[in-house]
Amino acid sequence: MAAKDVKFSRDARERMLRGVNILADAVKVTLGPKGRNVVIDKSFGAPRITKDGVTVAKEIELEDKFENMGAQMVREVASKTNDIAGDGTTTATVLAQSIVQEGHKAVAAGMNPMDLKRGIDLAVADVVATLIKNAKKIKTSEEVAQVGTIAGNGDSSVGSMIAEAMQKVGNEGVITVEEAKTAETELEVVEGMQFDRGYLSPYFVTNADKMVADLEDAYILLHEKKLSNLQAMLPILEAVVQTSKPLVIISEDVEGEALATLVVNKLRGGLKIAAVKAPGFGDRRKAMLEDIAILTGGQVISEDLGIKLENVGLNMLGRAKKVSISKENTTIVDGAGKKAEIQGRVAQIKQQIEETTSDYDKEKLQERLAKLAGGVAVIRVGGATEVEVKEKKDRVDDALNATRAAVEEGIVPGGGVALLRASLSINAVGANSDQTAGISIVRRALQAPARQIAANAGAEASIVAGKILENKGATYGYNAQTGEYGDMIAMGIVDPVKVVRTALQDAASVAGLLVTAEAMIAEAPKKESAGGGMPGGMPGGGMGGMGGF
């Protein structure tokens, strides 16, 4: 086991505080509409330029082990806030730095660290309750756009694009952000259910120009296993032919004789048909087939359920207004499923999302939910260079997460005003003077984000904070973009309450632990062994004996 280096009390806390300050000072320059960018060196490729707090925090690794511990704890604040709320990482870092600094002073003055932490926790719980009580629910698309604009660093095109996407796919719909191949940023919406499987044979194509198979008012046969023998399918194929409606077969695979016969029938014009593979694998495939069945009002033909293919009737097939199949994707628009059943399935998937602990499973369930509930919107972020595209994509991601959070829990005045106001209304009472000091630490920390936003905009932080607090209006604040004071909500400067709340809770949680640390242990640096030269005392001569080649 390697030797360890141990630091105690004041020495430990001071080193840790240095680490906290280095990381927080690098992150906090990005806060607010006039926050600056940070350039991050990459071992390969061009440097990355970003204004995203968590991206900056994740890049910082310090040489001194003890300073690094402090920095990593604050990095954890930013990451945790990002995971839960998706935005507010810089605010969380600024709050954590302030709590650690004030806490360090209090401990140095002889106060009890555990009581300070209890006081911090009391104050935070009080502030969170105040924030939730004062939150305003989002009702209009304009309000969604405002949240997106603020989180997107004042870029109104980002805000309006996210608002449009949410309007089209609903609040439950999936909105993904991708890098575009062009300079333009555009929004593409796929309505209905789309999955990433295309036609099994190009002979199924109905539109040769676009190479897609469009089938209107189609029947949909959902089969769990492979189809290789056509004999079992004949009864249902004959029934579909008589209705003169098209048929889409979705199964694990269609191969051999079955596929050849379907293609021949399609080419002869007797049967409008297309076959695609079922999406997903294993249990997820079963679940997705079940989703399609509920969406289209059909039934999955599965031997587990005792249903044989030869016994299938038209009433077991799904229906859809339109099925569009390209080489890579299949889209089912306007399925004939019952509303109540679809809503029941949506509720079931939501329940699974809450219960699962795996991020991967959560993401896949979220995709399934979106396909059932609304649709999928893709925002393709463009720019002149790769560096610009990456920087803009960071902002669009933040804006998207912020708008989702705003729709979920509502909004409060932005620009750090909600926290600044909350500092005046903390009613928590400490059991002793040290706990009261902990409450005061939070009261001071709550002013830090508003002060930092003002400082980044070139204003005098103390004057701005004082002027906001002089005015009794709950939504009165400072617009750092224009340098004016006024009603923040009327000016469209709003923050999602979930983001503000999460930032404060995560910052206080980690900062409270840092304040209570009394000893720190790190691996001792390895001493360089003395003596140079070549290993094993090999003589430094040449390889003369190897001549003659």
From Swiss-Prot:
Tree of life domain: Bacteria
One Gene Ontology term, aspect cellular component: cytoplasm
Gene3D superfamilies for this protein: GroEL, GroEL-like equatorial domain, TCP-1-like chaperonin intermediate domain
Catalytic activity: ATP + H2O + a folded polypeptide = ADP + phosphate + an unfolded polypeptide
Listed GO biological process terms: protein refolding
UniProt: ATP binding residues: 30-33, 51, 87-91, 415, 495
GO MF terms, alphabetically ordered: ATP binding; ATP-dependent protein folding chaperone; isomerase activity; unfolded protein binding
Matches recorded under PROSITE patterns: CHAPERONINS_CPN60 (PS00296)
SUPFAM superfamilies in the cross-refs: GroEL apical domain-like, GroEL equatorial domain-like, GroEL-intermediate domain like
Record localization: Cytoplasm
EC number: 5.6.1.7
Keyword Cytoplasm: yes
Keywords: ATP-binding, Chaperone, Cytoplasm, Isomerase, Nucleotide-binding, Plasmid
HAMAP family from the UniProt entry: CH60
Subunit details: Forms a cylinder of 14 subunits composed of two heptameric rings stacked back-to-back. Interacts with the co-chaperonin GroES.
Family membership: Belongs to the chaperonin (HSP60) family.
Role: Together with its co-chaperonin GroES, plays an essential role in assisting protein folding. The GroEL-GroES system forms a nano-cage that allows encapsulation of the non-native substrate proteins and provides a physical environment optimized to promote and accelerate protein folding.
Record's protein name: Chaperonin GroEL 5
Species this protein is from: Mesorhizobium japonicum (strain LMG 29417 / CECT 9101 / MAFF 303099) (Mesorhizobium loti (strain MAFF 303099))
